[in-house]
């Protein structure tokens, strides 16, 4: 049996119909999938950097960024999930929750509610908590946070300086920091975001 769809214990597995959305026939192992996704993410990041200065706090941009990041690998990239998960809001609530989050972030920016780092980290945390897509939510949310913090005049985050898709100490620190943010303690996630 292939390890293609084996997920870390703290990751959300794909549903069978979502697995069928794999576009790359050469992908047969988890290592292949990671390689294909990273190549697609790199292209999506380059596309996003070229769009600097444009409004990124729109639902269209949220979906388009995900499509640009994962569209060469998954047919459903850029489409909100339609299935339940062990994390995130109910699928029917995703559009409203994303719209509310973006409204909140625009308010925070306009009224200097938080400093730029905290504004971007709060965007990241809530986007992960909503979990709008079948897969790639953490990577997408980190990219959104990086783009926002840069738009607010700060350098992108280091996010622990590691590949957070692999099981390891840095991923555990990231998950623990997200769980602290779930309990309204943003300090560990802020620290992790700037750690190398």
Stretches with model-predicted labels:
Residues 1-196:
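FIC/Doc superfamily catalytic core
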């Amino acid at each position: 049996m292939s390890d293609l769809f084996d997920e870390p214990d703290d990751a959300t597995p794909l549903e069978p119909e979502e697995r069928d959305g794999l576009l790359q026939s050469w992908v047969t192992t988890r290592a292949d999938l990671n390689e294909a996704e990273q190549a697609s993410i790199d292209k999506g990041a380059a596309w996003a950097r070229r769009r600097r200065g444009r409004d990124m706090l729109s639902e269209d941009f949220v979906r388009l960024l995900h499509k640009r990041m994962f569209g060469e690998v998954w047919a459903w990239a850029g489409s909100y999930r339609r299935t339940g998960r062990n994390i995130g809001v109910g699928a029917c609530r995703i559009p409203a929750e994303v719209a509310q989050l973006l409204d909140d972030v625009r308010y925070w920016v306009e009224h200097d509610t938080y400093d730029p780092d905290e504004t971007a980290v709060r965007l990241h945390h809530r986007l992960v908590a909503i979990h709008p897509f079948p897969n790639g939510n953490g990577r997408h949310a980190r990219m959104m946070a990086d783009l926002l913090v840069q738009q607010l005049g700060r350098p992108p985050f280091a996010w622990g300086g590691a590949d957070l898709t692999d099981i390891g100490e840095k991923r555990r620190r990231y998950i623990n920091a997200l769980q602290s943010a779930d309990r309204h303690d943003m300090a560990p996630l802020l620290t992790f975001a700037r750690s190398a």
